[in-house]
Amino acid sequence: METQALQKVEQYALKKQNIFASSKIRYVLRSILASIFIGFGITAASKTGSYFFMADSPFAFPAAAVTFGAAILMIAYGGGDLFTGNTFYFTYTALRKKISWRDTLYLWMSSYAGNLIGAILFAILISATGLFEEPSVHSFLIHLAEHKMEPPASELFFRGMLCNWLVCLAFFIPMSLKGEGAKLFTMMLFVFCFFISGFEHSIANMCTFAISLLIEHPDTVTLMGAVRNLIPVTLGNLTAGIVMMGWMYYTLNPDQ
């Protein structure tokens, strides 16, 4: 059933490895680009959500979830390299013995580092615009950041796990579809599902925290709070990519 899609997963992983082998700088730049794209999505989502949030409307999160979907389209079609998707791509390809686990670890670390750099860079750029100076504009973003720093590590881990399961599927399922319209709709639908569900995405959180920390924020939004969130969320994202996606589809397709 997933044969052709899994072949594409393997091809993408090997293509990424080739980019890394030929130029580590180019690979990291693609990772930086991915989190910048997510930064655009976070900006659009938080500003859209703020209009409803300030009016105490229940549509704040649904509106933000819809607009955030633009981020995955920019990554998929704009050449970004996202750590969370790579957890699936490289795990599956490594299990197929087409790439070494050592290279897999290097690729994961490089994409994660690039994503972090991109998140910080975008936060610096967006804070320089002054667009988040007014509380009426940044209140929803701060609310998101505060809310993400509150749960215990165990809950954040499982929210991260379920999130990346959906995100990996958002990249994987469209590989079996025909027509760009169907692919675009599917990707945005899956991203809407993870956002509206309250799941945690490590790279999206990087962007949320980076922007929140650079603009006027309350004492409840701290760098340590961001770190305490990102560690379990990243581990949860990694677990989903390795086990729920990479290992699962390798096991379901032993003759692939």
Curated annotation (Swiss-Prot):
It holds the Pfam family Form_Nir_trans. The keyword DNA-binding does not apply. GO terms for molecular function: formate transmembrane transporter activity. It comes from the Bacteria. Keywords: Cell membrane, Membrane, Transmembrane, Transmembrane helix, Transport. GO terms for biological process: formate transport. It is found in: Cell membrane. One of its GO terms (cellular component) is plasma membrane. PROSITE patterns: FORMATE_NITRITE_TP_1, FORMATE_NITRITE_TP_2. Coiled coil: none annotated. The chain crosses the membrane at residues 32-52, 59-79, 112-132, 156-176, 184-204, 207-227, 230-250. It is a multi-pass membrane protein. Belongs to the FNT transporter (TC 1.A.16) family. This is Uncharacterized transporter YwcJ. The lineage of its organism: Bacteria, Bacillati, Bacillota, Bacilli, Bacillales.
